Amino acid sequence: MAAPLDQAIGLLVATFHKYSGKEGDKNSLSKGELKELIQKELTIGPKLKDAEIAGLMEDLDRNKDQEVNFQEYVTFLGALAMIYNEALLQYK
């Protein structure tokens, strides 16, 4: 049986691949795929406006190829983890 952290990492990877490749490159997320992932997988997702998601896409797309590759996705997850950690510290 996999350890909890192994399971969590596996879920993060599987979530990327669940949404990537529907509109093109199977190893990256288009703007539409990123939007769908955010809206379906994050609690805050449905509350975000299209302009906010577009801004997030622009921030994440470091190589400016109009897609979010796995490395850019992991950067996004790291930023989210930092936000979640700050929220947790406030409630301790």
UniProtKB/Swiss-Prot annotation:
The EF-hand domain sits at: 12-47, 48-83
- Keyword tags: Calcium, Cell cycle, Metal-binding, Mitogen, Repeat
Q: Which domain of life is it from?
A: Eukaryota
Give yes or no: UniProt keyword Calcium: yes
- MF terms (GO), sorted A to Z: calcium ion binding; calcium-dependent protein binding; enzyme binding; protein homodimerization activity; S100 protein binding; tropomyosin binding; zinc ion binding
Does the record carry Cell cycle as a key word? yes
* Pfam families reported for this sequence: S_100
GO cellular-component terms in the record?
A: cytoplasmic side of plasma membrane; cytosol; nuclear envelope; nucleus; perinuclear region of cytoplasm; ruffle
Job description of the protein: May function as calcium sensor and modulator, contributing to cellular calcium signaling. May function by interacting with other proteins, such as TPR-containing proteins, and indirectly play a role in many physiological processes such as the reorganization of the actin cytoskeleton and in cell motility. Binds 2 calcium ions. Calcium binding is cooperative.
What's the protein name?
Answer: Protein S100-A6
